[in-house]
């Protein structure tokens, strides 16, 4: 693999990275930073990579730079044709996994997994608001949801920030242009126009956090795929959260490679559509409770629970 391909692969996997972090990942030593400078600048000049800030600068993928294999888009089609391997999960097994996950969330009326319900409902009910007090309230909802879902632990830069760091991201999410992504159906999610919106909002979320002042302890504002997708799941319900369990399961089950990009998202949407009667019946059943569950939330529950069970055995 060439140096440029390694850089693109690392940025696709980790979000924003410094030159030193890239060098360490490629060569095992930050001191090799100068060795990748030429390749990095070539990618920047070709507008495949974006440089943000300084001392140290952060690098992230530009729109459309991350591809999973070869996309097969016909000129007269508005859908992405997702290349799926032999899928090793039946709709019956998927329903069982989703039910198991759901039943575990309702045991405790104040359980942490209900933070998704509260967050998604708040954003759903306040769509396109411009009220500053409401935006502040939504940022607080987002912060607590992310904390409940493990995004404020370890080396996360969010650990050193207050909830208001999310306000610029909330403003982006509330823009009218992203209305098609709210609770999007699996069929609509396979359309090129909506996948382009998803790519765009993902990149804008990365840039927003990258533009924030680094924490006082020097922690880089590294917006990972996990963080971006958890934000999108909790606010728009348009994509599963690409955390360790989800990625592990979709790879093992032959759904997709687990990389966060258009083909991977289209693949899980296609899996839903292939079993749409079964999944829609279950979705309507679950939606009789506090919130209407979007299709991608069901897929998140399914594959997370699958890997969670495997991890315990």
Report residues per predicted region.
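Helix-hairpin-helix
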Residues: 213-233
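Charged low-complexity interaction tracts in eukaryotic proteins
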Residues: 2, 31-70
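Positively charged, polyanion-binding regions of nucleic-acid-associated proteins
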Residues: 1-14
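Short, locally clustered residues in the helix-turn-helix/winged-helix DNA-binding domain
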Residues: 9-12, 27, 233
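DNA major-groove recognition helix of helix-turn-helix
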Residues: 40, 232, 236
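Flexible coil/turn residues that form the inter-helical turn or adjacent wing/linker of helix-turn-helix
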Residues: 15, 29, 239
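An N-terminal alpha-helical hairpin/helix-loop-helix interaction module that forms a charged
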Residues: 71-219, 237-313
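Short acidic, hydrophobic short linear motifs in intrinsically disordered regions
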Residues: 17-26
């Amino acid at each position: 693999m060439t140096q440029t391909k390694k850089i693109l692969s690392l940025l696709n996997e980790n979000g924003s990275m410094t030159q030193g972090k890239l060098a360490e990942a490629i060569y095992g030593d930050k001191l090799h930073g100068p060795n990748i400078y030429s390749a990095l600048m070539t990618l920047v000049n070709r507008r495949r990579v974006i440089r943000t800030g300084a001392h140290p600068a952060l690098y992230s993928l530009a729109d459309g730079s991350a591809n999973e294999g070869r996309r097969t888009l016909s000129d007269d089609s508005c859908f992405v044709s997702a290349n799926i391997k032999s899928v090793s999960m039946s709709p019956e097994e998927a329903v069982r996994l989703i039910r198991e996950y759901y039943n575990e969330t309702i045991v405790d009326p104040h359980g942490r997994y209900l933070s998704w319900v509260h967050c998604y409902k708040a954003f759903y009910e306040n769509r396109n608001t411009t009220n500053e007090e409401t935006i502040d309230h939504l940022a607080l909802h987002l912060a607590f949801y992310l904390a409940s879902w493990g995004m404020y632990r370890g080396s996360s830069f969010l650990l050193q920030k207050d909830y208001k760091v999310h306000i610029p991201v909330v403003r982006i999410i509330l823009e009218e242009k992203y209305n098609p992504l709210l609770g999007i159906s699996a069929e609509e999610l396979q359309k090129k126009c909506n996948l382009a919106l998803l790519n765009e909002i993902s990149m804008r979320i990365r840039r927003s956090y990258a533009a924030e002042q680094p924490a006082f302890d020097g922690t880089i504002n590294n917006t990972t795929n996990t963080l971006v997708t958890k934000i999108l799941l909790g606010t728009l319900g348009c994509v599963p959260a690409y955390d360790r369990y989800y990625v592990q399961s979709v790879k093992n089950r032959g759904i997709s490679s687990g990389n966060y990009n258009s083909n991977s998202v289209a693949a899980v949407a296609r899996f839903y559509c292939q079993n749409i009667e079964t999944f829609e019946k279950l979705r309507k059943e679950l939606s009789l409770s506090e919130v209407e569950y979007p299709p991608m939330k069901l897929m998140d529950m399914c594959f997370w629970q699958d890997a969670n069970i495997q991890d315990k055995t």
